[in-house]
């Protein structure tokens, strides 16, 4: 499947017979930023082959702006695609959280920054809610958006969070980094409206003894499974929230992990790894439900 603008595909997600991606012709992408030049988000219906234009603009922003106009992260669940981008009104251009419904082809703004000093982290979506972090002069705050009721709500976490994702029933967040302190993984139960600290460097359910600072990177969710990697090294972990077990898949990893995938059968986990010594790329697969 080719890109639609002959640009660079920068991120993607897929679930429930949909594949969504963002692309850009922005020459600044090579330095990991974007000035907003000819970016777009598309969705492909894998049942019919139809490709849908979701959103996009051809703008030029100064490099000094405090937000990235190009969506660097997409979250897909059911018919909903969510991402952080921007919106414009008579007062100017502001960062925003956007929701696109693939069924009715409507684009909705879940939240808009009230000033250029406010930015958003990458949102995550389940079949009812969008969850995202908002950053301003006071630090970070955690927000949810009820898609059906069109209502926002702020949820106070036990401590400031730096990364979040949502599952069927939970919000999972990583505590903000502090020097010489391990990060912690917190879980918010929607049904009981309650936070709990689930994983840190002292947690007994963790499979191995932790000799160094515990770090969580690239948090991802599918059903009630959470995956993450440490910032350094090639370890890979899966947490089954329902059984409260952590699987250490490090022994199954033989190369550098490029990214983690959830196939359409969500009992399985697939990741892409490469070998620095050879041009070989592998896609190991493991059935995480039986491992749990």
For each of these PLM feature ranges, what is it?
Residues 1-3, 50-64, 106-113, 150-156, ...:
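A short beta-strand motif characteristic of beta-propeller blades
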Residues 2-29:
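Beta-strand-rich domains and repeat architectures in extracellular enzymes and scaffolds
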Residues 256-292:
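Blade-level signature of beta-propeller repeat domains, shared across WD40, Kelch, NHL, RCC1
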Residues 45-49, 101-105, 146-150, 189-193, ...:
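Short loop/turn segments that connect beta-strands within beta-propeller blades
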Residues 27-42, 89-98, 137-144, 179-187, ...:
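Structural motif
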Residues 6-16, 62-77, 116-126, 158-169, ...:
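Repeated scaffold domains used in trafficking and secretory/extracellular systems
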Residues 19-22, 81-84, 130-133, 171-175, ...:
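Residue position within the beta-strands of beta-propeller blades
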Residues 88-93, 113-147, 154-164, 173-179:
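Solenoidal tandem-repeat scaffolds enriched in leucines and small polar residues
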């Amino acid at each position: 499947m080719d890109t639609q603008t002959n640009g660079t595909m920068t991120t993607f997600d897929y679930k429930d017979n949909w594949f969504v991606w963002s692309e850009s012709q922005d020459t600044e992408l090579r330095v990991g930023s974007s000035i907003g030049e000819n970016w777009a988000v598309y969705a492909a219906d894998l049942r019919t082959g139809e490709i849908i234009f979701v959103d996009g603009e051809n703008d030029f922003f100064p490099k000094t702006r405090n937000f990235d106009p190009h969506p660097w992260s997409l979250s897909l669940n059911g018919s909903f695609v969510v991402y952080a981008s921007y919106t414009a009104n008579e007062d100017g251009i502001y960062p925003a959280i956007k929701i696109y419904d693939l069924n009715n082809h409507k684009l909705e703004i879940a939240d808009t920054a009230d000033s250029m000093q406010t930015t958003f982290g990458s949102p995550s979506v389940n079949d009812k809610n969008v969850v995202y972090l908002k950053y301003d002069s006071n630090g970070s705050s955690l927000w949810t958006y009820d898609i059906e009721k069109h209502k926002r709500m702020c949820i106070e976490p036990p401590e400031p969070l730096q990364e979040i994702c949502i599952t069927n029933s939970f919000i999972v967040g990583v505590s903000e980094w502090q020097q010489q302190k391990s990060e912690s993984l917190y879980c918010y139960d929607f049904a009981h409206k309650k936070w709990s600290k689930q994983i840190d460097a002292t947690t007994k359910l963790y499979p191995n003894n932790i000799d160094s600072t515990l770090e969580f990177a690239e948090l991802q969710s599918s059903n009630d499974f959470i995956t993450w990697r440490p910032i350094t090294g090639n370890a890979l972990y899966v947490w089954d929230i329902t059984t409260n077990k952590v699987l250490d898949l490090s022994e199954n990893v033989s190369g550098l992990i490029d990214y983690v995938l959830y196939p359409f059968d969500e009992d399985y986990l697939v990741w892409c790894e490469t070998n620095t010594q050879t041009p070989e790329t592998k896609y190991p697969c493991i059935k995480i439900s039986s491992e749990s």
